[in-house]
Amino acid sequence: VTAPSAEKKTGSFERRIYMNNSAAFKCIECGREHHVGEVEYVCASCGGNLDVLYDYGRVRKQLSREGLATDGNFTMWRYRPLLPVEDSSPVPPLTVGWTPIYTCSQLAGRLGIKEVFIKDDGRNPTASFKDRPSALAVVKAREAGARIITTASSGNAGSALAGMCASVGMRSIIFVPAYAPAAKVAQLQIYGSTVVIVEGSYDQAYDLCIEASRRFGWYQRSTGYNPYTREGKKTAAFEIAEQLDWDAPDKVFVAVGDGNIMSGLWKGFNDLYRIGFIDRLPQMIGVQSETASAIVDAANGDGFVREGPAHTIADSINVGRPRDATAAVRAIRESGGCGVEVSDEQILAAIPALARETGVFAEPAAAAAYAGFLKLCQAGSLKHDDRVLVMVTGNGLKDIDSARRSVK
C-alpha cells in the first residue's frame, strides 16, 4: 500500500459526475471504476476497497446550509443527498447521529490551546460510533433483499449491527474473537444475534466471516469490505462541521484500527468542501496503540502498510491487518496530519483523565484518541491558536474491566 504524493489539501476520492447522486464506485487501490450493479463489495480486478462516487452538482441542488438550519431531522439521515440510499428506502427507527460536541474551555486554557472540542459518539443507540455504518448497511441489505446480515467485530460493530437488525426485524450473525469484552458479547446476545466466538484474533474472525458470507449468501457488512461503511462513518464529519457553524477544526484526533473511521471522516470533510459548505479541511491525526500501529507506522514512514501482530488493551483497535489501510494512510498524509503511537498505560490513564476533565466516559479505544492528543500537547506539537476536536467513538461501559484497571 502506497500513500500518494498528492497535494495536501485535496482528497483522493474521485469527483466524477454521474446521473444519480451515487451511481458508481472507484477502486481505491487500482483506480478501476465500476457501475453499482457491476460489483457488490470489492473491486473485480484487484479485490481492493471501493469508494462511492457522487454527482456533487446534483447534491448542491438538493442540500443547502440554509435548508439544514430549518431541518428538524436531527439524525445522520439529514444528509441523505450525500448518502448512497434510494429515496424510498426506509431507515432503522433508532436515532443515530447528531451526537453532542462539548466545548472544553477550561481544558483548552490549561493546555494553552485556543479551543478543544469533544465529539461524544458514545451517545448513539448502542453506545458507539459504529451505529452510523451499521444503520446504513442495514438499509443497503434491505434494498438488496437480504434476510441475514453478518459482520466480524471485536464488539462495537457487532453490537451496532445487532441493535439495528433488531429494530427492523432482521437476523444478524456476528463473528467475534474470544478476547472480546464480556459486556460487548452480552450486548450482542441481548439483541438476539447469533454469536460465533472465534478462538483467534480479530483478523481471523474477519476472514472466517467473509468466507461464511460467500458460502451462505449472507449480506456482508464488515469494515473494509462493504464500501458503504465508509459512507455511514463520514456523517460524523458532516455533524462536526455543522455543529461548529461550518468552521472545521484545525485538527481531528481519532483512534485507528482498520482505518475506516479515519477514511470516512476525511471523505466527509472532502464532500463538504466539494459542495462549498466548508472552505478548508482539517488535519487528520490518527492514534494507535504502539503494539498495533500498522497505519501510524505507514503514515509517518514510507507509506507502506506492513501487517504484524496486535496486542493492545483497546480491543476496538486491536488490529494487525487493517482492512481500510490505503484510504486511512492517504487521509492522514493528504490532510497534512500525522500518526501518534500511545502505550496501553497511556490509554488506561486517559480514561479517567478524559472523564475528570470533561465528564465523558470513554472505552479504551476512544480514550486512545485523547491519549494521543495529550501526547502531542506535552510534546509541544500543537499551536496556541489550534482548534482541536477529539473523536470519542465508544462509551466506557463497553469495557468496564478496563475502566476498573484505569483507577487502581
For the regions a language model picked out, list residue spans one by one:
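Short amphipathic, helix-prone segments within low-complexity/disordered or flexible regions
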Residues: 3-7
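PLP-dependent amino-acid enzyme catalytic core
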Residues: 18-408
